[in-house]
């Protein structure tokens, strides 16, 4: 029954959602997972996958923050909203990463660097083309989607075990 149901969920269970990248976000998914986690515990489901999804989201955000902070520079997060093409920041995984960076006493800027001379650690938080973005020279770029190339900066394809 579960397998047959998943066959009809091709809008959600699709390559669009099965790529490396930033954590789940938005005003709906995290809220829904929290409610479903409560319900799973309320009915003693036996395994709370929804709670685990939220714990993993938090842990992954903290892991990315550790990577960003490990370079000792101020941080610029490109992509403050919860997804591209919107200004909504409710449940933004990028802002969660920024929160953890601030807890580690780092200065975080969103969607642009305040200085053109300073070297930053950039986070490419959305799955989009950044090839025309004017990164400050000799900066570090952490790419969650493992696509960006840059000859003037160090690029880290986060999560790539073949680097």
Describe the predicted segments one by one:
Residues 1-163:
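Structural/interface elements that position substrates and couple domains in central-metabolism enzymes
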């Amino acid at each position: 029954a579960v397998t047959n149901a998943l066959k009809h969920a091709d809008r959600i269970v699709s390559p669009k959602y099965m790529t490396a990248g930033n954590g789940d976000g938005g005003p709906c998914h995290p809220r829904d997972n929290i409610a479903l986690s409560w319900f799973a515990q309320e009915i003693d489901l036996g395994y709370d996958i929804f709670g685990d999804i939220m714990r993993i989201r938090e842990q992954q955000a903290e892991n990315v923050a550790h990577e960003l902070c490990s370079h000792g520079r101020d941080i610029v997060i490109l992509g403050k909203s919860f997804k591209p093409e919107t200004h909504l920041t409710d449940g933004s995984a990028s802002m969660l990463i920024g929160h953890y960076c601030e807890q580690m006493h780092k200065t975080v800027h969103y969607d642009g660097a305040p200085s053109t001379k300073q070297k930053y650690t950039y986070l490419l938080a959305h799955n989009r083309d950044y090839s025309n973005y004017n990164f400050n020279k000799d900066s570090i770029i952490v790419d969650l989607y493992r696509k960006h190339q840059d000859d003037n900066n160090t690029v880290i394809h986060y999560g790539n075990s073949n680097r």
